[in-house]
């Protein structure tokens, strides 16, 4: 995964720079999000790696799919998408499109002053608790925060909140682990 992100970074940065210059940041995001979903489809992935299909056939398949899913963004970026796909095909890097989408989203969030935070929980949080967590994080980081909710039954109870390198582990599992370490120490 880390290697794929490293490989994806220059492609995402290039598209981001182009998106800034041409005022097409959101169009690129829509395209990358759609490509990510397309590439994660097992049937499409099988066709991409199947040597029976030529590079031209693969490019046509992907372009047709992206045009169907994101017609407006594809229309705006038609030539750029064509060039981008050809570059990825030539470099044998089509399978890192989901990673390019992830890095691009991170670049866009940073540019827009948005922080993504994940809240891992066992028992679902009500809207009031979600809003309270979001407000506290926005206050702490002085930025808009997008919450991603992740269910994990291994926590036993409580929550773990992650935002960038910052982690707040308020889970029962985390407390038990820390208690066991203290008793050993």
Swiss-Prot record:
Q: Where would you find this protein in the cell?
A: Cell inner membrane
One example of the protein's molecular function in GO is: proton-transporting ATP synthase activity, rotational mechanism
The record's section on Pfam families has: OSCP
The record's InterPro entries line, in alphabetical order, gives: ATP_synth_OSCP/delta_N_sf, ATPase_OSCP/dsu
Instruction: For this entry, list what GO says about its biological process.
Output: proton motive force-driven ATP synthesis
Q: Report quaternary structure and partners.
A: F-type ATPases have 2 components, F(1) - the catalytic core - and F(0) - the membrane proton channel. F(1) has five subunits: alpha(3), beta(3), gamma(1), delta(1), epsilon(1). F(0) has three main subunits: a(1), b(2) and c(10-14). The alpha and beta chains form an alternating ring which encloses part of the gamma chain. F(1) is attached to F(0) by a central stalk formed by the gamma and epsilon chains, while a peripheral stalk is formed by the delta and b chains.
Q: What is this protein called?
A: ATP synthase subunit delta
Q: What is the lineage of its organism?
A: Bacteria, Pseudomonadati, Pseudomonadota, Gammaproteobacteria, Legionellales
